[in-house]
From Swiss-Prot:
Protein's GO biological process: endoplasmic reticulum to Golgi vesicle-mediated transport; protein transport; vesicle docking involved in exocytosis; vesicle targeting
Residues modified to Cysteine methyl ester: C195
Organism of provenance: Xenopus laevis (African clawed frog)
Family from the record: Belongs to the synaptobrevin family.
Name under which the protein is recorded: Synaptobrevin homolog YKT6-B
PROSITE patterns: LONGIN, V_SNARE
A Gene Ontology molecular function term of the record: protein-cysteine S-palmitoyltransferase activity
Pfam families: Longin, Synaptobrevin
CDD domains, A to Z: Longin, R-SNARE_YKT6
First-tier enzyme category under EC: transferase
């Protein structure tokens, strides 16, 4: 999972222009880096130009995903990431960056601003912080821990059962479970197996 670009743009009436951007092109060869960076800027501007105000969308290009968020006030953000990077985290990042940008940079400067004139330096730190979505986003961290717990729980259940033994057999032989609990287990098992067949 990797983030390559984080950009803040202004969607004017006739033209979209870049206000500020940060790039991580370290995974590309040295001679390709400037071309890749130019292409990311071009792609970001094109996607914002073709997106409606008040919209969020993701555009796939080969193994990359471009996530765009254009606010109603014409401020827009674009994240370019690989396919594996979670889109929810990208949109959370865009929302956070655009909100912070709008409070730190005067709205009057947006239509005429450029990367050289806009005083906002947080993009590089956001780009590096969000390289690992699990560390940057609490929901991703919780989801990953939940997935790990499910795997451990599944492995534990498998190891508790002896070779050739099935949970169904154990339930039917159990003296601890009441008839109502056994009936509930069998009914649940039948309903789940019905869904598996379809």
């Amino acid at each position: 999972m990797k983030l390559y670009s984080l950009s803040v743009l202004y969607k004017g009436e006739n033209k979209v222009h870049l206000l500020k951007s940060a790039y991580d092109v370290s995974s590309f060869s040295f001679f390709q880096r400037s071309s890749v960076q130019e292409f990311m800027t071009f792609t970001s501007q094109l996607i914002v130009e073709r997106s409606d105000k008040g919209s969020r969308s993701s555009v796939k290009e080969q193994e990359y995903l471009c996530h765009v968020y254009v606010r109603n006030d014409s401020l827009a953000g674009v994240v370019i990431a690989d396919n594996e990077y979670p889109p929810r985290v990208c949109f959370t990042l865009l929302e956070k960056v655009l909100e912070e940008f709008s409070t730190q940079v005067d709205r009057i400067d947006w239509p005429s601003g450029s990367p050289a004139t806009i005083q906002y330096n947080a993009l590089d730190s956001y780009l590096s912080k969000y390289q690992n979505p699990r560390d940057a986003d609490p929901m991703s961290k919780v989801q990953a821990e939940l997935d790990e717990t499910k795997i451990v729980l599944h492995n534990t259940m498998e190891s508790l059962l002896q070779r050739g033994e099935k949970l169904d057999d154990l339930v039917s032989k159990s003296e601890v479970l009441g008839t109502q609990s056994k009936a509930f287990y069998k009914t649940a098992r039948k309903q789940n197996s019905c869904c598996d067949i379809m």
